[in-house]
Curated annotation (Swiss-Prot):
It comes from Klebsiella pneumoniae (strain 342). This is Probable septum site-determining protein MinC. The gene is minC. InterPro entries: CAP/MinC_C (IPR016098), MinC (IPR013033), MinC_C_sf (IPR036145), MinC_N (IPR007874), Septum_form_inhib_MinC_C (IPR005526). NCBIfam families: minC. Interacts with MinD and FtsZ. GO terms for biological process: cell morphogenesis; division septum assembly; regulation of cell division; regulation of cell septum assembly. Disulfide bonds: none annotated. The keyword Cell division applies. Residues 107-120 have a biased composition (Pro residues). Cell division inhibitor that blocks the formation of polar Z ring septums. Rapidly oscillates between the poles of the cell to destabilize FtsZ filaments that have formed before they mature into polar Z rings. Prevents FtsZ polymerization. Keywords: Cell cycle, Cell division, Septation. Residues 98-123 are annotated as: Disordered.
């Protein structure tokens, strides 16, 4: 047990980002309620970041804040804000203003080549294996590794992995790969019929899955800024 009353540690969490393309509070509220109704177990009372970059000239923050709060979503921060007046208004509401990370400038090349590190022997990545059906209401999490399910996943079940997710059976529940922020994570399944699929926080609800892949063997991964899907051969 630590001798200090608190301890600060760095960590990372995956949050959904609500990108506003309309500044009308009622339109925003209705659109969010429609999305929440499609995946209530995943989205109801979920923490979110609100990006206002596309609409900040038109934003009346108090009304938008109330509209989003009325849906049950919890605003953890606002990004994409550059107008000083609006920044002040959001800050006074007690909501953090977030700055999206920028790419670091490349370091100058060293004058002498650095010798490569010695090879690591017997480096093993753990994998969590589930042989039983995953039933509605069950949640399975595979921290720091891949998750393999060799059976069916029912509607209402949830699979979460920091690495890849493989489902060799009917996938009807929710699959969240790259939960720790790994954008290279992927989802593989032999029968794609999921309520929700997510990689590093980028997600599709069932109605976003292209019809030609629904119920088929599929592989999902992140493109530059959105999920992509292709046949699993």
């Amino acid at each position: 047990m630590s001798n200090t009353p608190i301890e600060l540690k760095g960590s990372s969490f995956t949050l959904s980002v609500v990108h506003l393309h309309d500044a009308n509070p009622e339109v925003i509220r209705q659109a969010l309620e429609d999305k929440i109704a499609q995946a209530p177990a995943f989205l109801r009372h979920a923490p979110v970041v609100v990006n206002i970059a596309s609409v900040e000239e038109e934003v009346e923050w108090r009304a938008i804040n109330e509209a989003i709060a009325a849906t049950g979503l919890r605003i953890m921060g606002v990004s994409g804000c550059k107008i000083p007046r609006l920044k002040t208004e959001i800050d006074r509401a007690g909501i953090p203003l977030l700055t999206e990370g920028k790419e670091k400038a490349p370091r100058p090349a060293p004058s002498e080549p650095t010798p490569p590190p010695p090879p690591v022997a017997n480096q093993i990545t753990k994998t969590r294996l589930i042989d039983q059906p995953v039933r509605s209401g069950q949640r399975i999490y595979a921290p720091h590794c891949d998750l393999i399910v060799t059976n069916h996943v029912s509607a209402g079940a949830e699979l979460i992995a920091d690495g890849n997710i493989h489902v060799y059976g009917m996938m009807r529940g929710r699959a969240l790969a790259g939960a720790g922020g790994d954008r290279d994570a992927q989802i593989f399944c032999t029968h794609l019929a999921a309520e929700l699929v997510s990689i590093a926080g980028e997600y599709w609800l069932s109605d976003n899955i292209p019809a030609e892949f629904y119920g088929k063997a599929a592989r999902l991964r992140l493109g530059e800024s959105a999920l992509t899907v292709q046949p699993l051969n």
